[in-house]
Structure formats: C-alpha cells, structure tokens
A protein has these predicted regions:
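Conserved residues at the C-terminal ends of beta-strands
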Residues: 70, 141-144
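Conserved small/polar residues in nucleotide/adenosyl-binding loops
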Residues: 133-140
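N-terminal beta1-alpha1 cap of cysteine-dependent amidohydrolase-like domains
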Residues: 1-88, 92-96
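Cysteine-nucleophile active-site neighborhood
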Residues: 70-132
Length: 150
C-alpha cells in the first residue's frame, strides 16, 4: 500500500472556521478525493504551522511515497512564524520525498524553497483555470506556453 503525506496549509483557526460553517477543510477534501478513486493509498496529515510535534514528522519523511501540499489563504509575501515553519518543513520534504504535488499555496512554498521567485499578481488574486507556462530552467524567466494537448 502506498503512503502519502498530506500537508495542511491553513492555520488551525481557519480550518475551525470552515468546520464551524459546515465546509470541509482542503485536507479533508483531498483525503475524500483519494478515497473515492482508490483504497490502496494510506494518508497521514500534518500541519507545519500548528502541529507542535512537527519535528517528529521530519524524522519519518522517508516512509512516504509522495506528498500533497494543499492550498491556503496564506501567501508567501507575509513573514510570519507560521509561514516560516511551512517553508522549513517543505525544505525537509524536498530533501526526503521525491514525488510532490504542490497545489496553489503549496506551490508558492515549493518554488520559494527551490530558490525560485513567486511574483505577486498585478490583477488581484486568481482562482480558476489559466494558461500554464513552462521554462526549460527554473532560472529562465521567459518560459513558453504548454501545447494544448498537454
């Protein structure tokens, strides 16, 4: 059985407000989605911003076949202890887990740890579908549009 670590990006207080409003957290939705498609994946959840025992998880990262780092209302431009804790945890994950799916906030953290730059959107926040641009090197700022067949 495959073992996946799911990282919760939101602060515990924000997740509580979702729960109080009858809305699933991002992590709960991810777990439900995985369970819908297969029962052959075991998941663990960690919240680097709120979990006091996060150092225990760092020691065991090699046991995971992959990692899913979900979204959050946070942004990489704020300098808070919670964000710094997530950046440090991602740094350890990138050393020890080879297969990482980073979604929205998770991608901001992953790019920052890898030495890339996340640029602030000049047209306000974006949600939904958009064109995806790739570059041959993380340092190449030009990029190119992915073929529509991708």
């Amino acid at each position: 059985m495959k073992k996946i670590l799911i990282v919760e990006g939101n602060l515990r207080e924000e997740n509580q407000s979702f729960t109080d409003g009858g809305i699933k957290t991002h992590t709960e939705s991810l777990k439900d989605s995985i369970a819908y498609f297969t029962d052959k994946i075991e998941t663990d959840v960690v919240n680097p911003s709120s979990d006091k025992n996060i150092s225990e998880k760092v020691v065991d990262l090699e046991k995971y076949d992959g990692l899913i780092w979900g979204g959050s209302s946070l942004n990489i431009y704020s300098d808070t202890i919670e964000i710094r804790r997530q950046i440090e945890f991602m740094r350890e994950c990138q050393k020890k887990i080879k297969k990482i799916l980073a979604i929205c906030w998770g991608l901001q953290v992953a790019v920052t740890v890898a030495g890339g730059q996340v640029k602030r959107c000049t047209n306000g926040s974006h949600r939904g579908i958009c064109l995806l641009y790739t570059s041959p090197s993380p340092r190449d700022q030009r990029g190119s549009r992915m073929p529509s067949s991708a």
